[in-house]
Structure formats: structure tokens, C-alpha cells
């Protein structure tokens, strides 16, 4: 599959300052990257930071706000990674000084780049922990309902399996980035979601609505 026709999925998160505005700015900047065409942006979900409070590695901090962006790219994974690292820097992230598992003004993960595979210290594609994270799978399913990961696993089936394992995140639906008051955010229309308020998605129900089979 050529890069021009490959689905690219990116996971974005933030929990420092005005996290919604940070996410909105990141989406806008992604759309300005040469060779990247943003197609759809998920609803915003809130999740507790990891490790949890009962873990000795836990760092006290606010919950994260997370989204998944679906795009098409004519650039490869390495060039896209370089672009996302630069966007993180522009939005205030300092990877050299930040605390491990600490708060982040912005975090951009390359989750899937078509059927490309990389396994290097600086870049692993597809992201190795997609199937372990409801805050990735739920918004990914929203923007990529028929999505199939490079290993052949359907995104919906991965979400059902995660829910059945009992290790799914305490994920809350927050709203949409279109609720952010900014004149500059250029965002494509996406699946409908509540404009405000919190609700916990029923993960198995969400997945089954998108055709998962167990």
C-alpha cells in the first residue's frame, strides 16, 4: 500500500494547562505538515494518568485528555515522527527535562502508518501497546470503524478483548474539539458526540456497535 493511500492514525494527549486548547492547536499544526492530510478527529476522552496511585512509580498529576486523528500521508513513518516531535516542541514539550510518567503539555504518538512496520529504539510502528489502551482503542474505533491493525486484528475486536480482560481504562467522554473557542482550528466533520458532560462508554457495547465478533 502506498503512503498516499495508507491510513495514518495518531494518538494525542495532554494534561498540562489548557489541555483542550493544546489538542486543538496540535490538530491544526498537523494539518499544516507537508504531506499530511487530516481526515477525521475523534471525540475527546479523559483518562487517569499511568501508573495508577497504588503504583510506587505514580506521579501526582491531572487526568489526560486524549484524541485520535486519522489522516493520510505521502511521507513515511520516520519523516512523520520527526514532524510530530517538532510539533511537540513548538507546543512546549521538553523531552530532555520532563519526568518519566509525568505530566505532558502534549504527547503525539504514531499508532499506525498503513501496513508499515518498524521496530527500532526511536520508532516502533504499529505502536506496541495499542491493544492495551482503551483511551486509544475507543477514539480509534470512532474515526476508523472498520479498522484492521497490521497484524490482522480488528480494532473493534481488540476493544472487546480489552473490556473482557478487566484491564480497560476508566475512560470518560468529554466532548469535541469543535467546542474549543478558537478561530483558527480547521477541523473536518466527524462522528457526532455530546457537546459537553461526562459519560463512561460501555466498551463492549461500543465495539459491538462497530461489528466486532467474539
Regions found by a protein language model. Name each.
Residues 35, 50, 59-64, 81-214:
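Flexible, gly/pro- and Lys/Arg-enriched active-site loops
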Residues 2-10, 16-105, 114-115:
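Nucleotide and nucleotide-moiety/phosphate-recognizing core
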Amino acid at each position: 500500500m502506498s503512503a498516499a493511500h495508507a491510513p495514518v492514525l495518531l494518538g494525542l494527549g495532554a494534561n498540562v494547562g489548557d489541555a483542550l486548547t493544546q489538542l486543538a492547536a496540535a490538530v491544526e499544526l498537523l494539518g499544516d505538515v507537508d504531506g499530511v492530510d487530516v481526515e477525521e478527529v475523534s471525540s475527546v476522552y479523559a483518562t487517569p494518568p499511568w501508573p495508577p496511585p497504588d503504583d510506587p512509580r505514580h506521579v501526582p498529576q491531572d487526568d489526560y485528555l486524549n484524541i485520535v486523528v486519522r489522516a493520510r500521508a505521502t511521507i513515511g513513518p520516520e519523516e512523520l515522527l520527526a514532524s510530530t516531535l517538532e510539533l511537540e516542541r513548538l507546543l512546549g514539550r521538553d523531552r530532555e527535562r520532563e519526568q518519566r510518567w509525568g505530566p505532558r503539555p502534549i504527547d503525539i504518538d504514531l499508532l499506525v502508518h498503513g501496513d508499515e512496520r518498524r521496530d527500532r529504539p526511536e520508532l516502533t510502528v504499529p505502536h506496541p501497546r495499542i491493544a492495551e489502551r482503551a483511551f486509544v482503542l475507543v477514539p480509534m474505533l470512532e474515526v476508523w470503524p472498520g479498522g484492521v491493525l497490521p497484524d490482522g486484528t480488528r480494532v473493534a475486536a481488540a476493544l472487546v478483548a480489552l473490556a473482557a480482560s478487566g484491564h480497560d481504562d476508566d475512560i470518560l467522554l468529554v466532548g469535541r474539539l469543535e467546542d474549543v473557542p478558537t478561530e483558527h482550528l480547521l477541523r473536518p466533520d466527524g462522528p457526532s458526540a455530546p457537546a459537553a458532560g461526562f459519560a463512561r462508554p460501555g466498551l463492549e457495547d461500543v465495539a459491538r456497535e462497530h461489528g466486532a465478533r467474539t
